[in-house]
Amino acid sequence: MLSAITNTSPIDNEFFIEDSRVYFCGIYEDTLLKGVSPTDFHCWHYWGKGSSSCYMGGIRLRGADAASFQALNYAYAMDISAVYTTSGRISGADISTFQILDNGQNDFGAPQGYAKDKNNVYFHNGDGKVKVLKTADVCSFQSLGDTYFAKDCRHIYAYGKILPKADLNSWKLIGHLYSCDDTHIYYVNRKINAADRKSFRLYTPLTAPSFCDLLARDDNNCYINDEIIEESYWLDRLKRVKDECMSE
């Protein structure tokens, strides 16, 4: 995935060349990679390496082996002796069996995703250390591809946590982080206790931009995410969502 650097102008979360030097374009400032030559620098999004050093954005990965370093996806990279996330190394990961399970990027463009080795299942959301899913069955565990939801032979997982009381056989995705089984409605990894399963309906279009409000309702309540709100406010938010969809 790593290829020779070609950018000559700043692009958010990308490396670029200026005045024969390599920089990383961060959200708030550009970072100079000291001592790095653009002639042998290879990169992919915010993973990069020179002849003797490796980088996650503008941060040098201490001890990383440049010869074997490779980007696996947006959330994970590895070399001959370690696995890296955008928050640092995964302690104890088995290099020979480590595998990514999705593309490592959520719908907001942030690094996030599931991975596993012969011993453990991992979830990384770009905020803090990677989470080890200690109850997960390694052999049967699979990501559902959106970096939020996953399952194994015993449980459904959402954002790295077991979905409470979810029935494995009847569970399905509704859309926009909502899901359900025969008796429950969920938002991400939280059960919406007040929701009526039979009448619950998602109103935010599946094609809506990721920043739109997530709106749903049933016969009894109106919801934004998993919060009950007044119908008048809900209708106003729904109009805005529809307007945002029309403007896309």
Predicted regions and their residues:
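Non-catalytic tandem-repeat scaffold regions and their flanking low-complexity/translocation tails
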Residues: 2-248
